[in-house]
Amino acid sequence: MMPIPANPTNASIQPRSLYDAWADLAWRAMLTEVNLSPKPGLVDRLNCGAHKDMALADFHRSAEAIRHWLPRFMEYGASCTRLPPESVLAGLRPLGMACEAAMFRATAGVNTHKGSIFSLGLLCAAIGRLYQLRQPIAAETLCATAADFCRGLTTRELRQNNLLLTAGQRLYQQQGLTGARGEAEAGYPLVIRHALPHYRALLAQGRDPDLALLDTLLLLMSLNGDTNVASRGGADGLRWLQQHAAFLLHQGGIRTPDDLVYLHRFDQQCIERNLSPGGSADLLIVTWFLAQISQVNH
């Protein structure tokens, strides 16, 4: 895992420099997640997981393309502080779509980080809003602000009875899964209540950072109603993945390098079942990003 460099403490630092520093942190979060290995069913440094259309280099190019857009989300968040928070999302959508287009150009059409554009875009806009309002920028305040932005999102977008259902609407109607929208609207409870405290506790105990992050990924996989998994393996596939991740945690999790053998085995099983917990990977990116947010002095 790449170390975070010391940041300047000059009180006169300009917002643009701060925005770049936060954007750099989000970029590092994306790289940290994809480079983390071995991950069950996911692209990493060892293999392409359950994916046949993407590889590690695609994620590196994608993260670099997204990196340059993240300060714009912060600028927008700072520019609309007079708007009620639930009105902010509409203005973020064009930015998100433009950022997605940059991702697709960088990857020749491969969807590597669409979920992260949504989550990091929300959190970066929250950073801009809180900074402009001179309010604390911390994991809890950022997630609460993102939730305010997304108020009513699940009802508007998932509970509609259209003739042509999107994948997200279909999974919601069939299995009650709200996916990234529901997690954001709820203020990222899987991160705030579970993954982030778990990761911080492991680091405080002296656990190797990569092993701590892999253990945290298992925790997310055991709890998350991952729409990526459900779309590939249905309710049975999601249940199997959640139960297997929970079993590994019950057995002690990923404490030492010797425990990686269990992840290698889990990875092969996910590949055989064509399961990829991309939603949990996105939440791991959010977890790492929020764990490091205090590194930027503001």
UniProtKB/Swiss-Prot annotation:
TM annotation in the entry: none
Single Gene Ontology BP annotation: prosthetic group biosynthetic process
EC number, as in UniProt: 2.4.2.52
Annotated GO MF terms: ATP binding; triphosphoribosyl-dephospho-CoA synthase activity
Catalytic reaction annotation: 3'-dephospho-CoA + ATP = 2'-(5''-triphospho-alpha-D-ribosyl)-3'-dephospho-CoA + adenine
Keywords assigned: ATP-binding, Nucleotide-binding, Transferase
UniProt KW Nucleotide-binding keyword: yes
Keyword Nucleotide-binding part of the UniProt annotation: yes
Similarity comment: Belongs to the CitG/MdcB family.
Protein name as annotated: Probable 2-(5''-triphosphoribosyl)-3'-dephosphocoenzyme-A synthase 2
Organism: Salmonella paratyphi A (strain ATCC 9150 / SARB42)
Gene responsible for this protein: citG2
